[in-house]
Regions:
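Feature for soluble, non-membrane regions of globular proteins
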Residues: 1-204
Length: 204
């Protein structure tokens, strides 16, 4: 049985960068809808609840064809959003430190160059999707995925271990930023939880 994970902070905690109305809809409506689809799919295919969702979506080709699409979309959506909420924090932002900062400088030249590349990946993702910072073969890379796909999936164009992701579906920013996606991406850096990202990097 899948459940909507708590955010860990109030909906208004990320103001003014991400507004309370967006956070509320995004969590209670959009994320909750994925949970509903997963529970309905698990009723048809009970194996869905036997393993962590990350493990299942990393091997989509092993999922029965009649449930593969909802598992990919809703399983991806549930994993991506759970990961996204933990990537954000009130009074956060700033810049990473320590080993992660060194790895970012080594891979991209500087923190600003990394942000530019990440923002470009988010801004140029056509339609809906996500931009990611991943570890691939021991190195940091920026990638993007369509829809609710992510770099864990065996179907992803660029596979790796996600460290940070940003949702560029319109529902993630439209109420406040309308079609100004680059403005939302610029604001996102003010609420990135670098402690969490560093913790993921240590484990990757």
């Amino acid at each position: 049985h899948f459940q909507l994970p708590p955010l860990g902070y109030p909906y208004e905690a990320l103001e003014p960068h991400i507004d309370a109305a967006t956070m509320g809809y995004h969590h209670k409506n959009h994320h909750a809808a994925f949970i509903g689809v997963l529970n309905a799919t698990a009723a048809k295919w009970p194996a869905l609840t036997q393993k962590p969702i990350a493990e299942i979506i990393s091997n989509l080709s092993a999922v029965p064809e009649d449930v593969r699409t909802p598992v990919r979309n809703a399983g991806g959506g549930h994993w991506n959003h759970s990961f996204f909420w933990e990537s954000l924090a009130p009074k956060a932002g700033g810049a990473p430190t320590g080993k992660l900062a060194d790895a970012i400088n080594a891979a991209f030249g500087s923190f600003d160059a990394f942000k530019e590349k990440f923002n470009a990946a988010g801004a140029t993702r056509f339609g809906s999707g996500w931009a990611w910072l991943i570890v691939k073969d021991g190195k940091l890379e920026v990638s993007s995925t369509p829809n609710q796909d992510n770099p864990l999936m065996d179907v992803a164009e660029v596979k790796g271990t996600p460290l940070l992701g940003v949702d560029v579906w319109e529902h993630a920013y439209y109420l406040k930023y309308q079609n100004r996606r680059p403005e939302y991406l610029a604001a996102f850096w003010n609420v990135v939880n670098w402690n969490k990202v560093s913790e993921r990097f240590e484990k990757a």
